Amino acid sequence: MRKFGIIGKPLEHSYSARYFTDKFSREGVDAEYRLYERDDLSDIAELMQALHGFNVTYPYKQSIMPYLHAIDEVAQTIGAVNVVCQGKGYNTDWIGFKESITPHLWDTDKRVLVLGTGGVSKAVQYALQQMGMAFTLVTRQKGERQGAIAYAELTKELMQSHSVVVNCTPLGMLPDIY
């Protein structure tokens, strides 16, 4: 039996185990998919040996990269990994975002506001760049990223001047919805 899973913390919100368990069952695949909630990556080498592949979620999309044997060119460019297969890291977040948002962007002059600077934000920024779309990045502190603005600088007018807002922060994740 092949073993797969997802690593991150928290994982209470994750539908991955249910989704893949159902998919494997429907398609007659001899595999299992489990949640691997971790406080840190201290056992990642053992986990990579035990699993055929796994997904990576918050907060490890960037910090897992030094542990990998190889990294796909796109994931390297993005600076974040969300899929690991046999020790090689990939990023599929960007294409998932691109495919999801494209039907809603009939006007290519839309201005996009990206909240957050973590792994998902990096994938979203990459997708927007691939689509030729301008965006404004919002960070915790002024000067954190060139061309970005701080949350403290967000105004009603600035929010209204952007037709798309993408939340790439952990705000609202279960179980800590606030």
Regions found by a protein language model. Give the residues of each.
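Phosphate/diphosphate ligand-binding glycine-rich loop within oxidoreductases
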Residues: 2-104
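Conserved beta-strand elements of the Class I
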Residues: 5, 113-115
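Glycine-rich Rossmann-fold phosphate-binding loop(s) that bind the pyrophosphate
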Residues: 9, 116-118
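Short helix-loop-beta connector
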Residues: 105-111
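N-terminal Rossmann-fold NAD(P) dinucleotide-binding loop
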Residues: 121-122
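NAD(P)-binding Rossmann-fold cofactor-contacting core
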Residues: 131-147
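Rossmann-like adenosine-cofactor binding region
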Residues: 147-178
